[in-house]
Amino acid sequence: VVRTLDTLGRILTDFGNEVLYITPNEFRSVPLPSYPEIRLSLMPNRKVAKMINDFQPDAIHIATEGPIGRATRRFCKRRGYPFTTSFHTRFAEYANERWKVPTSWGYGILKDFHKDGETMMVATPGLVSELKERGFTNMKLWARGVDLEQFTPGDRSLLDKHERPVFLYVGRLAVEKSIEDFLEADLPGTKVIVGDGPQREELEAKYKDAVFTGPKYGDELTKYYQASDVFVFPSRTDTFGLVNVEALACGVPVAAYP
């Protein structure tokens, strides 16, 4: 999601637009319980209102349903400003996986959050159909793409030191990504895990035969895609999974849920 929004901002800037991101970095924040990488902003309402007033935007897009997103939504509704939203993350499934909150409750909260926007942007036609069945309305497809100058087939030698075939995962190491389903699978060759997250220490200790590289970025990340034999994406909670497209662009077959 971060990379998608960063790319969007760069493209908008290239077209002569000014872009303001309102993020938790601008506020006092606390870590989300059991998920410290996600920061929850404390009492953002007043500062959000000031930032928007000072910037005087022509368009407002709310990308998350957390405290900043809610503060922005509240500000827009009070002022009568139109805004759009996007559905990036299956928080209902995340909450069920981590805290056993019924998914129906989670989707009820999400549906209420998104209903007042001009439109809700969704990543895939399948997700549009699913959310429509759950009662969401006024959705538009917002497809994703990757930089084909960066992600392209190339030199495969980086992972030659490992027994092939090499099965690669790239992404956050967290329980909702179902990485253990991949690590438990009886597969030949080597499993390589690129990324970081709250589950990393536990997974490294439990699965000694897997190779954990930590996070990789830019050209270095591309080289891992290029050198692998199969990309594996075991998550059932992602709305899109941009890493799948990155792997395909590098000429690597993908094993994932439809």
Give the ranges of each region predicted by the language model.
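N-terminal subdomain of nucleotide-sugar transferases
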Residues: V1-F27
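Nucleotide-sugar donor phosphate/pyrophosphate-binding loop at the beta->alpha transition
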Residues: P82-T84, E93-D112, V122
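Donor nucleotide-sugar binding/catalytic pocket of nucleotide-sugar-dependent glycosyltransferases
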Residues: Y107-G154, T213
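Conserved donor-binding/catalytic core segment of Leloir-type glycosyltransferases
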Residues: M121, L158-V192
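Nucleotide-activated donor-binding/catalytic signature segment of Leloir-type glycosyltransferases, i.e.
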Residues: R200-D219
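Short alpha-helical donor nucleotide-sugar binding micro-motif in glycosyltransferases
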Residues: P215-K216, K223-S228
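Aromatic "clamp/platform" in nucleotide-sugar-dependent glycosyltransferases that forms part
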Residues: R236
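Short hydrophobic beta-strand element within catalytic cores of glycosyltransferases
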Residues: P253-A256
